[in-house]
Amino acid sequence: MKSAPRGAIFWGAALVTAGVVILAIQQGYVSDEILAEATRWWPLILIGAGVAVIFAGSLGVVAIGLAGVLLGLLIGGLVGAGSFPTACGDDEPGQLGSFADGSFGGSGADVQIDLNCVSLEVGGSAGSQWVVEADEESASDLELSSGDQRLEIRSGDSVSLGGRRHVAVALPRDGGTNLSTSLNAGDATLVLAGGHWGAIQVDGNAAAYVIDLSDAEVDAIEASLNAGSAGIQFSDQTSVGSVRLSANAGEFHVCVPEGVGLQVTIGSDVAVGHNLDDEGLTEDGDVWRTPGYTSADTRIDIVFSGNAAAFTLNPEGGCS
């Protein structure tokens, strides 16, 4: 019989272990005290990698499997705890000041925000004007370009040594603006409540998002996380065309009020955890629905996929 590739052994051990840890956390078998220490487990990555290198010879398969288990413990602990540390430090973001402003020439403008190690705030405002504010360190590094129907904001090439930067962006909320954000380390709060938005694209690497779509009209939202978390708030007046969420070693918290028809399709991926049965949804293959879904005035359809990932509906602490 042909032996399994070492890469398959490593990731198989990691994902199986992560899945077991996530399930143990969701079932309450792991105490809050242990979860509080989850973010301190990152040295397991170094230990696992070192073991794999040292014993890559005669004990290679065993070492690779052990390294995968160690990585799985870390991933499972972080996903289950919903806590993802970033490399930006704990310093408070700097005070905001004026940076740039302008206006769009019509509806359907495209906005691209691509930032590193930052606390980002995005909100909606009346009219066609956009406004960007930044703290002193961010202002010296931001690259901004704009046109009649576009706005691009990017981090420059310099490396931040003073902790998180601070950027705030106000956009027209009623013009069907298309918003794309990409965050590498840091956190973002997108307050898009009550607005009319086009397509919303969210990408995060070691990032934490809070997205408020209460009473908003959105053509589509797509969010992808790697080692991150996101909380998404819907209301009974939210209108959204499609919602696609994916995570690798990440977690989504989704808040939906009672009375909204919710359908969640869970992809057949590895080590994906959820609480949909606990929240009273009924299962039909890969699809979960709230009672009365078909007759609800407001319906929200979500497609979720991932590896070593978790989907939590209406968590006790909310989605903020």
Tell what function each PLM region has:
Residues 1-320:
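Alpha-helical transmembrane segments and their membrane-interface anchoring/capping motifs
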